[in-house]
């Protein structure tokens, strides 16, 4: 049992709410922040507040952005005939690192997960359907290769095929049960190259 002042305990609790941060790590982060010079703490707090206040979702793809549309959607050099569907904005960063994909993206902000009570209406599928037009030739489904990701991929294929668009799935160079965020660049590159039609 720790005997920290209430303000320290509160900060530990807030850090512990972050994904992947347990009590011990939250405690270390809190103590580190308390040892920083006041101006650095203020900069850190201001950066959090500014990011939360200015960052929004792109109205086209759902990526994080500070201007709408985002830098990718407004880039005239991107191939708008290909849309890569991903689960979260962080997956865009993973795919952009390999510098082999020049299409656009669509962020679902989740996956279909009946066990978690998330159905198709709980993810950004309506936005994807709105984007399908005569200019879109292919939709690459790059959801994670786990049960929820596969279920989501199959559902997307089912709703898009009647619209006459080619639907492909990234190859499984990404390990089953893994996340795109943790895949290395070569694995992601091979997964994109080896995508298959659904």
Curated annotation (Swiss-Prot):
Annotated GO MF terms: DNA binding; zinc ion binding
Database matches in SUPFAM superfamilies: Recombination protein RecR
Gene3D superfamilies to which the protein is assigned, alphabetical: 3.30.60.80, 3.40.1360.10, 6.10.250.240, RecR Domain 1
Record domain Toprim: where: 81-175
Chain intervals annotated as zinc finger (C4-type): 58-73
Entry-linked PROSITE patterns: RECR (PS01300), TOPRIM (PS50880)
Swiss-Prot/TrEMBL GO biological process terms: DNA recombination; DNA repair
Source species, domain of life: Bacteria
Keywords annotated in UniProt: DNA damage, DNA recombination, DNA repair, Metal-binding, Zinc, Zinc-finger
Function text: May play a role in DNA repair. It seems to be involved in an RecBC-independent recombinational process of DNA repair. It may act with RecF and RecO.
Annotated NCBIfam families: recR
Family as reported in the entry's similarity comment: Belongs to the RecR family.
Name of the protein this chain belongs to: Recombination protein RecR
Source species taxonomy: Bacteria, Bacillati, Bacillota, Clostridia, Eubacteriales
Recorded name of the encoding gene: recR
